[in-house]
């Protein structure tokens, strides 16, 4: 398993396929953050996520966390851990003091608190 920076141009078709498979809405390429991570296994992308950074601030917003719906569940789980940890490292490297994220997916809520030491500050919003 290997993480790498995402390339909005080259990775966009993969992201669109994953969003479509999961029946998520589609995000225009120009609206994706320039900073993001893709995790691959043997050169095959398994998951990805992005990090918006507020210009002139030390605030980040982690968004668009998504996996290949056809990936084996354990592999996707391990890749997600790498992806989110890599996004948080990217935030640290950029000297961000706060990274916020929002999701209605309970599995991600649990993942963020259990595996990534994130604090749930709001729910049902």
Question: What is each stretch, according to the model?
Answer:
Residues 3-4, 24-27, 117-123:
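Short secondary-structure junctions
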Residues 16-42, 47-67:
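A conserved beta-strand-loop-helix scaffold within acyl/acetyltransferase catalytic domains
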Residues 54-63, 71, 75, 120-124:
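A conserved beta-turn-beta hairpin within the catalytic core of GNAT-like acetyltransferases
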Residues 67, 73-91:
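Conserved acetyl-CoA-binding loop-helix of GNAT-fold acetyltransferases
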Residues 99-110:
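Conserved beta-strand-loop-alpha-helix junction that forms the acyl-donor binding cleft
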Residues 110-118:
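Short, aromatic/basic amphipathic alpha-helical patches
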């Amino acid at each position: 398993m290997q993480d790498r920076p995402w390339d909005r141009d080259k990775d966009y078709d993969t992201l669109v396929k994953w969003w479509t498979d999961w029946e998520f809405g589609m995000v225009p390429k120009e609206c994706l953050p320039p900073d993001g991570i893709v995790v691959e296994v043997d050169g095959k992308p398994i998951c990805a996520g992005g990090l918006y950074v507020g210009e002139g601030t030390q605030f980040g917003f982690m968004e668009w966390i998504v996996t290949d719906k056809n990936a084996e569940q354990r592999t996707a789980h391990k890749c997600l851990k790498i992806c989110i940890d890599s996004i948080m490292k990217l935030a640290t490297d950029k000297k961000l003091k706060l990274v916020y994220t929002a999701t209605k997916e309970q599995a991600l809520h649990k993942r963020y608190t259990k595996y990534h030491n994130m604090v749930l500050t709001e729910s049902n919003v």
